[in-house]
Every structure is written in structure tokens, then in C-alpha cells.
Design a protein with these regions (language model features):
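Exposed extracellular interaction/assembly regions and N-terminal maturation sites
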Residues: 3-94, 125-142
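Solvent-exposed, conformationally flexible loop/turn segments
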Residues: 29, 113-117
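Terminal beta-strand-rich extracellular "head" domains
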Residues: 95-113
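Extracellular disulfide-bonded cysteine-rich modules/repeats
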Residues: 116-125
Length: 142
């Protein structure tokens, strides 16, 4: 398989795992390249300044398509700080190509939540070569 430091454990039991969190004084806006090789959770600590497109990829040198096998999934989280004017993730891409996520509750968000932390979670399932299903959710923390 491909993977990111993959280990085959057979029928082993996993007690716990730790996921890499990157925290940056960055404002969500424009197109954001989410490099899954770098982190599982990305925390933006500056108020969002515009709606944004999230492009999920392996990293600047590796496509998500090339690092995942068919039948694999990854789950990532994007924490976005919101101020008095809130913005939202209005588009999702994988390796630069648009995808339409399936949102929890059936509807994509149309706004962010003021004076909150908005946490977007995405489960990306590779169903065929360069074909992905994206399950998404937005949760407000205040």
C-alpha cells in the first residue's frame, strides 16, 4: 500500500493514537491547501477574513490520490476562529478538483458563527482512482 508511514498490524488492538495538530496565527480566506501529510488538525487562531475554499491534498509534492489506496479513508479537522463578522467554507477541493461534500444534517453551511470557533471535520473516502466521497460537518464552539 501507499500510506503515510503505514504499519500493518493484522488483528492488533489499538488503545490510543495521537494526531498531529498545527496551530497558526492565520486567518481563513481564499484557497487554503490542507496538507494531510503535515497534520490531522489545523487550528487557525486569527479571525477569518473571508469565505474560503479548502483544497485537501497530500502536500505540495504529493497528491491525496497518490498517497491513498481505494477503500481507505482519512479524517481531518479545521478549526477556524470567528470574530464579529463570520465567514464559512464555501467550497471543497481534492487535489485542486472540486468535490461536493455530503454534510451532516443534509445541508451545506451558508454562514459561519460569530465570536466562536467553527470546527469543520471532513472524512474523505477514496472510492476509485481520483474519486472521493467527502462527509463533512460544522460544529460551533463558543
Amino acid at each position: 500500500g501507499k500510506g503515510l508511514g503505514r504499519v500493518s498490524l493484522g488483528a492488533a488492538k489499538i488503545q490510543q493514537t495521537a494526531e498531529k495538530v498545527t496551530t497558526e496565527a492565520t486567518a481563513a480566506t481564499g484557497t487554503i491547501n490542507y496538507d494531510v501529510i503535515t497534520q490531522a488538525v489545523w487550528n487557525f487562531t486569527t479571525n477569518a477574513s473571508g469565505n474560503w475554499t479548502l483544497n485537501i491534498r497530500g502536500d505540495g509534492s504529493n497528491s491525496l490520490n497518490n498517497i491513498m489506496d481505494v477503500g481507505e479513508s482519512i479524517t481531518i479537522a479545521h478549526i477556524v476562529k470567528q470574530g464579529g463578522t463570520a465567514y464559512y467554507n464555501n467550497a471543497v477541493q481534492i487535489d485542486g478538483s472540486s468535490v461536493t461534500p455530503e454534510y451532516q444534517g443534509g445541508s451545506a453551511p451558508t454562514a459561519g458563527n460569530t465570536n466562536s470557533l467553527d470546527v469543520y471535520t471532513y472524512t474523505v473516502i477514496k472510492t476509485a482512482n481520483a474519486t472521493f466521497t467527502v462527509l463533512a460537518a460544522l460544529t460551533q464552539y463558543a
